[in-house]
A protein has these predicted regions:
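Acidic, contiguous internal or C-terminal segments within carbohydrate-active enzymes
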Residues: 71-74, 116-170
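Aromatic-lined carbohydrate-binding surfaces of glycoside hydrolases
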Residues: 97-99, 108-109, 132, 163
């Protein structure tokens, strides 16, 4: 950092050379001040505290950090089964947080796909893909929801994209 403070960083390979070595690396870190930052590689560095952890058990993706506990579900009425911040539950029922457009919602969705984009001690990023469905089971739109949690931060970043993948249906 410009002021001399060391900040933890994590890397995710974006492209590799034919021999398997990293060609392009996305480096993530939490900047706390504006200005020029310098990347220093130190292979002897131990993981930072606090850290964020991701585990998967029976279709449930559990994200734990020092401030947040979140469960992302592959099935059921809600994308999030649990959301707890600083020990305080933020969802009463799994369906309390849903994506909706008109009468279509993730509450009626039977199954969704969860993909791990990044999992490091510093940050966890998931991509949830599914459908907005009406009560009668009619699919109206597909969605892709990005979920991002950083160690040490009491916040969740959500970004959602909707897709109309049904030919001839608006």
């Amino acid at each position: 950092a410009p002021g001399g403070e060391w900040r933890p960083a994590a890397g995710r390979p974006l492209a590799q050379w034919p021999d398997g070595s990293v060609r392009w690396l996305l480096v993530s870190f939490g900047a706390r001040e504006a200005g020029t930052h310098r990347l220093v590689v130190n292979p002897d560095t131990v993981p930072t505290q606090p850290e964020v952890r991701l585990t998967q058990v029976d279709g449930r993706w559990i994200i734990d950090s020092d401030r947040l506990h979140m469960v992302v579900c592959e099935a059921g009425p809600g994308i999030l089964g649990e959301l707890v911040c600083d020990g305080v539950p933020r969802l009463e029922h799994p369906g309390d947080l849903c994506l909706s457009v008109d009468d279509a919602s993730t509450r009626y969705e039977q199954k969704r796909t969860v993909q791990v984009i990044e999992s490091s001690p510093l940050r966890v990023r998931l991509r949830v893909s599914g459908q907005l469905v009406e009560a009668d089971g009619t699919c109206r739109l597909h969605y892709r929801l990005g979920i991002e949690i950083w160690a040490g931060w009491p916040a969740v970043r959500l970004d959602c994209h909707y897709f109309n993948l049904q030919r001839g249906v608006l």
